[in-house]
Amino acid sequence: MSRFSEVCSNVILRNPKHVYGRLYVVSAYAGVTDLLLEHKKSQMPGVYTAFATGGAYAEALDAVRLRFFELNASLKAEGLDVGAADLFISERVSGVLGYLNSTADLLASGYVSRTELLSAARELLASIGESHSAYNSAKILQAKGYSANFIDLSGWGDPVARTIDERIALALAGVGDRQEVSFVTGYCKGTEGIMREFDRGYSEVTFSKVAVAVKAREAVIHKEFHLSSADPKIIGPGKVVPVCNTNFDVADQLADVGMEAIHPKAAKPLEMAGIPLRVKNAFDPDHDGTLITKDYTCTESKIEVVTGTDKVSILELFDTRMVAEVGSDYRIMQVLVEHDTSYISKATNANTIDLVLWDRDLRPEMVATLESMFDVVKVIPVAIVCAIGSNIAKPGILAQATGAMAQAGINIIGVSQTARQTNMQFTVRREDFVKAQRALHAELCEKGPLDAVRIR
């Protein structure tokens, strides 16, 4: 959204005959949600953090207000009425500040649930960013002479309690009957709280629900990059290629290690409704992007994507009693459920269970509970590297992958693959993360189809 001029020419107005009859679910401008909440990667505090910790949240919010004004000024050349845009967002910010002040007073009383009120404050702050960008987008298109509609799902000024689906249905009623282009806020207010379950993935959830509500022929996500065979920053831009076609199972595998084509809980409604998802590079408009469907299987056996993460650790649980005991795994799962934690992969033998977990989920209290239950509990920082595809069931492919890493001097700590054969996961030392991806991509993606694989 921060490169709106290019998005406008490459996407919204690219085909003059197909401007209308489209709904764009928009996110906030780059960096805005980080300022309102906290930085997604570095966790640098934002307005919400200041509010939750009793800090100077009013000053932090005023700083964001100035950032909104800067963004508005940068869009003047696109036709945005900067004065009207400043007034719109300033009124929102002032309104939010008033709500936060009232909430702070309630929290100080000690008579209310801190968790519930902080959750509401987080949602309130998040909503501003999408309302700002959607409003601006509609106004710019109107200035260019198009019939454009701003659809605000934030529930601003609406005291009626509605579920997310109810609010979407109400807001979109009759939209398909009008000759216009609509810009919809990525945040949607609902009684269930969209951020309580999806947190920063909420805009894609709204996108998915909107697509299902209007029975879209196709849902298209416009990103700053292609869904490619690997991260070009690691492999090199001249070596990776767009995936072009895959299925929702592969998309789920990618999301499991943090390479999200779409939030997994947002993908599911599209998959169940039979709506194809297309991931396009907004800055490469001539390319069709990658089409994700429910039943696609590549006609040739090949690895479609090499990816992974170095932000995981092995939780190793060793106990000599496991070999003769039923239920060790069950007891571990009970602890994970209590701490709202899921694992990425698991390996077992007679007396050891290894779980690969996100580093952020390895809470000291959870580890302490497990230490009281088993002889030895270790946390080992590692990385996971995956070779993923809709059709990788080919004799010798696992040998080819492990051979490539052996040639690169990489020791494989663990291997995981299910009978569906869509994802080979390799656990390696964290320092081998980049080297392992390069080795796998060179061997499995740069050498052509797996039909060339031969067992020697």
Model-derived regions: residue spans:
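Conserved H-loop
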Residues: 27, 282, 348
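A conserved active-site cap/scaffold subdomain adjacent to cofactor or substrate pockets
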Residues: 247-321
